[in-house]
């Protein structure tokens, strides 16, 4: 029988399976994406059931599976994020964050920056009701792009290297572009450009502010970057 292993993970999604089990999609600290089955957790007397809810951060003991599905044999709560579950806006933003990680990071290779980013996002949404904003959610996505290796070029034209007159964005080129390279691009305001740069370098809790018009451009830039380079389509941030 395979030896059990321990890891810490965030529950991204939970799906009912059979009469009493659940299939879990997890993102772990040291093993990347993990699929697992938690047997019997939907029974009333199960001690693990309440610890394996989506958005929870948990310390797990798992038994190695033959394929991609491991078996949960033990679970302890690290952070259940109880307060964000009481606020619709916070819950929606947290669910969006977990969905983005689920769709973008499908490898079993560990990505500690991405894991730490997700944990920070959930903790922030749990503790700060005012954090559940469009601007903050887009800042998380920009940082996730960076952690996944898909951050766009923002310092110079992604096509030719020009550093002035940068007023458009092209996902196919890889970022911001100059007038001479703007075929297939869309206009990007200076405010939206500043937001994109600031979102990468500033802490999540201190994300840049921007108008709704600029945030719409940011959302489009992130979405098109994901679609073109990662072949992932996420629901736009409203």
Annotated model-derived regions:
Residues 1-238:
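Non-catalytic alpha-helical scaffolds and adjoining flexible linkers that form interface surfaces
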């Amino acid at each position: 029988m395979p030896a059990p292993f321990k890891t810490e993970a965030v529950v991204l999604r939970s799906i009912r399976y059979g009469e009493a089990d659940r299939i879990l999609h997890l993102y772990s600290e040291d093993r990347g994406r993990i699929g697992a089955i938690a047997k019997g957790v939907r029974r009333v007397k199960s001690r693990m059931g309440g610890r394996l809810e989506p958005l929870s951060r948990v310390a797990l003991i798992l038994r190695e599976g033959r394929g991609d599905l491991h078996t949960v044999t033990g679970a302890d709560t690290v952070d259940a994020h109880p307060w964000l579950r009481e606020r619709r806006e916070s819950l929606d933003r947290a669910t969006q964050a977990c969905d983005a990680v689920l769709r973008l990071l499908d490898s079993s290779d560990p990505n500690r920056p991405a894991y730490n980013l997700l944990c920070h996002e959930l903790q922030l949404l749990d503790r700060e009701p005012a954090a559940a904003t469009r601007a903050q959610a887009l800042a998380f996505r920009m940082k996730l792009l960076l952690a996944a290796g898909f951050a766009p070029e923002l310092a110079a034209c992604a096509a030719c290297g020009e550093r002035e007159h940068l007023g458009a964005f092209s996902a196919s080129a890889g970022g911001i572009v100059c007038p001479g390279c703007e075929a297939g691009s869309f206009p990007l305001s200076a405010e939206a450009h500043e937001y994109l740069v600031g979102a990468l370098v500033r802490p999540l809790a201190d994300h840049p502010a921007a108008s709704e018009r600029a945030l719409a451009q940011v959302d489009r830039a992130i979405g098109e970057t994901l679609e073109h380079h990662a072949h992932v389509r996420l629901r736009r941030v409203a």
